[in-house]
C-alpha cells in the first residue's frame, strides 16, 4: 500500500506543480509557490517527504529565502510518517485522500443538469464558474493563464443547469492523469445552484471518463474541516490515507 500512496501523492504533487510559479526541491521538502493565487492552502504548500531529519533548518531556510511575497506556506505531511513531528507549528487541518471504485459506482441522473467537455473556445466559461465556486474572482487572471497554458494536460468538465429551459453554468471540475492514476480536482458549484445534485452529476461524468480510459479507481482530496467528507463517502469514496496540514508563517 505504501507504493500506492506514493503514486497517488505524486499525482497530487504533479497537479499542484501546474499551478506553481516556483516549484523546487530543497532537500526533503518540495516547495510549490504562486503569490498570484493568494493564501491558498492547496497550492502554496511545502510537501515533507518521509525521512526529513533537519526539517526545522530547512523550513527556516525557506522562510528567509523563498517567501516570494507570500504570508504563509502550508506544510503537508502524510500522517503515517513516523519520522516527522511538527509540534512547533500551528495545525491548519487534516486532509483526507479518498478513492472510488469506478466499477461499483452507482450513476446519478440529476434533473435539468448537463455536463459537457470544455474545449479551448469555452475556457472563459469554465474559469468564470471556477472563480465563482471557490470565491476566487480576484485571481481570475492568474487562473486564466494557468488553465490556458496547461489545457492539454487536463480534462475540463462544465455542468450547466436548466431549471426553465434557460442555461446557467453552475459547476465545474477537472481530471488529471499521472502514474496510471486519475485524480478529480477543482470540483465546485456556484453558490446559487448548490444542493441541486450538480456535484454528483459532475462526479458521474468523471466516472464515465475514468472507466472509458481503463481506470478502476479515481482519487479526490478533501479537507475534513470543510465537512465534505460525508458527501464523498455516501457516493462510495473510501479513505486511503490522511495528511496533516500545518502553517509556516513567513512574516
Predicted regions and their residues:
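Conserved GNAT acetyl-CoA-binding A-motif
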Residues: 67-77, 210-222
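A conserved beta-strand-loop-helix scaffold within acyl/acetyltransferase catalytic domains
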Residues: 137-190
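Short amphipathic alpha-helix that is part of the acyltransferase structural core
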Residues: 1-12, 45-52, 95, 102-141, ...
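Acyl-donor-binding surface of acyltransferase catalytic domains
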Residues: 50-113, 246-248
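N-terminal charged segments
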Residues: 1-68, 81
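Conserved active-site alpha-helix within GNAT-family acetyltransferase domains
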Residues: 80-91, 200, 224-242
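A short helix-loop-beta-strand connector motif used in the catalytic cores of GNAT acetyltransferases and
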Residues: 17-24, 68-71, 94, 148-158, ...
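Conserved acetyl-CoA-binding loop-helix of GNAT-fold acetyltransferases
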Residues: 54-62, 186-189, 195-208, 212, ...
